[in-house]
Amino acid sequence: MNVTTTRKDLMIVNMGPHHPSMHGVLRLILTLDGEDVIDCEPILGYLHRGMEKIAENRTVIQYLPYVTRWDYLATMFTEAITINGPEQLGNIQVPKRASYIRIIMLELSRIASHLLWLGPFMADIGAQTPFFYIFRERELVYDLFEAATGMRMMHNYFRIGGVAADLPYGWIDKCLDFCDYFLTAVSEYQKLITRNPIFLERVEGVGIIGGEEAINWGLSGPMLRASGIEWDLRKVDRYECYGELDWEIRWQKEGDSLARYLVRMSEMTESIKIIQQALEGIPGGPYENLEIRCFDIEKDPEWDGFEYRFISKKPSPTFELPKQELYVRVEAPKGELGIFLIGDQSGFPWRWKIRPPGFINLQILPQLVKRMKLADIMTILGSIDIIMGEVDR
């Protein structure tokens, strides 16, 4: 009697780069045994544009419009890190009013980023309704951005020594009204989502990361705080005026996808608390340190140089970066966004190394999805929160 043997063949599947759950042009090469994930290999680089090399051939002001294309959903943070480096290299003092305006814009940008994480994350695991709800509040944030900066996205608002323009008349009252309304919207999200049994089935206990493991992988932001580590650069470095405001670090100890969801939801309410304090305590005075223009150096082009022959005009005066090196960082919505900057006494940086949080956080994805089901990949990847413009640079 012949006994039939079951033959098991592994299947290799390409997920992305055009898959709607990839949040950009990420490609995953999956090895599957039925529904079980045996191996996962991320393929990056489809959105690589050479942002670091572009920075080394531009002045800081020329480079500002480029940086908003890294994380194009939280552009205020990429602008902040771009001007913080030269400010620290040159010992440039930022007026208190400008620092408060920056904090307000950064926290509004954090809220907008978390909202546009929440909607697609819920859609990935099968809940369509929140995807439409989040755009209602996100439009209000973009209305505030448009009134203050002139742009809904890609704002180009931060400047060395301050910001590009002061807040318009009536903007503070409009922003305070938004803060009061948004707290009710967050409570509506929590009633709709947090205790939903289907949602809990999809996220609870999925993609668990321990605290020590998160540190060893170099994770940051909500990924780190959801694993029981109370670490927030706004508290640690106290950049801008965060040290003058009263707020708390939101964290969870479970380390799963549910914990990362809870951290981001509570971070939005903390951002509202920060914005309200900043709006009520914003001082008067200038919004830009005009003394910085005294450091601008004008160079005469050579008669056979590029400017004379092709541009037909003199280059504008620009701030020279001192011959030093510096690492500067901010707490972006996805984690620690940093820049390693080397100046060489010229208008162009000698080295501009970007430390993107999404790229570092994405490293742990293959380990998290192994021995999980195929459907859990969307949950885990969505809970990491990546933007491929920032990952590939």
UniProtKB/Swiss-Prot annotation:
Top-rank taxon: Eukaryota
Reaction(s) the record says it catalyses: a plastoquinone + NADH + (n+1) H(+)(in) = a plastoquinol + NAD(+) + n H(+)(out); a plastoquinone + NADPH + (n+1) H(+)(in) = a plastoquinol + NADP(+) + n H(+)(out)
Primary enzyme class: translocase
Name under which the protein is recorded: NAD(P)H-quinone oxidoreductase subunit H, chloroplastic
GO CC annotations on file: chloroplast thylakoid membrane
Family matches, as HAMAP family: NDH1_NuoD
Main location: plastid
PROSITE patterns: COMPLEX1_49K
Pfam families: Complex1_49kDa (PF00346)
Gene3D superfamilies named in the record: Cytochrome-c3 Hydrogenase, chain B (1.10.645.10)
GO molecular function: NAD binding; oxidoreductase activity, acting on NAD(P)H, quinone or similar compound as acceptor; quinone binding
Enzyme Commission number(s) of this protein: 7.1.1.-
Naturally occurring in which organism (per UniProt): Oenothera argillicola (Appalachian evening primrose)
